[in-house]
Amino acid sequence: MINLEWKELDQLEIEEKVQEVLDYSYNTWMSDKKNIRYFVRAFYIRWDMIAYMYGMEENETEDDKLKSMFDFGISELRNITEVEWIMGYCMLINPIFFEENDNYLELEEKGKEMLHNVAINNPDDVFLTSFGIPEKDYLKWKRANREQLIQYGEDNFSYDSEFSRYFKHIINCRADEEVEKESFLKKIVRRWKQR
């Protein structure tokens, strides 16, 4: 996986400038649409914000931007590991954010398929591989790869941002005990509410 640290965006996050984070990430991505770092981080920040706001208030502008990025990612960046990973992950967790014509279950399956493809195509990446381990084999695999997963989190997600904290937490859950994703999203919602 490429380095996804984005210092300018991370600084805005540290300063808790939510609207600036949203605007800066999207506008920078729009100026260089094939930049993978910009795409992954701008896509994630929108997904995260919408997950946080889900059920509280609608933000059609950000919803539309996320769907526009989704369409672009599918049509222009689909075979790029980091894009397929972030889109597959977000679709698996919240397919409702991407649905049209009530195709919720289809999108959830597509997210699983994308993550499975990423796992198969990246056998040397312990984190990405973890998304392709069958459930019945996962506990044994997790125990055998615990140290590698923890090191992966340190190597790839040790910068100061919501993105980094979120995925480092996910990696630690994969290394230790599996935690319900919904409960972590509730934590994210609490953080965003405090802003």
Regions found by a protein language model. Name each.
Residues 1-34, 38, 195:
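N-terminal alpha-helical scaffold/docking segments in eukaryotic complex subunits
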Residues 1-7, 31-55, 78-97, 123-137, ...:
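Amphipathic alpha-helical repeat scaffolds of TPR domains
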Residues 11-25, 57-69, 103-109:
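Helix-turn-helix repeat elements of alpha-solenoid scaffolds
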Residues 17, 96, 107, 137-141:
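Residues in the short coil linking paired helices within alpha-helical repeat scaffolds
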Residues 26-34, 74-79, 116-121, 150-158:
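Solenoid-like repeat scaffolds
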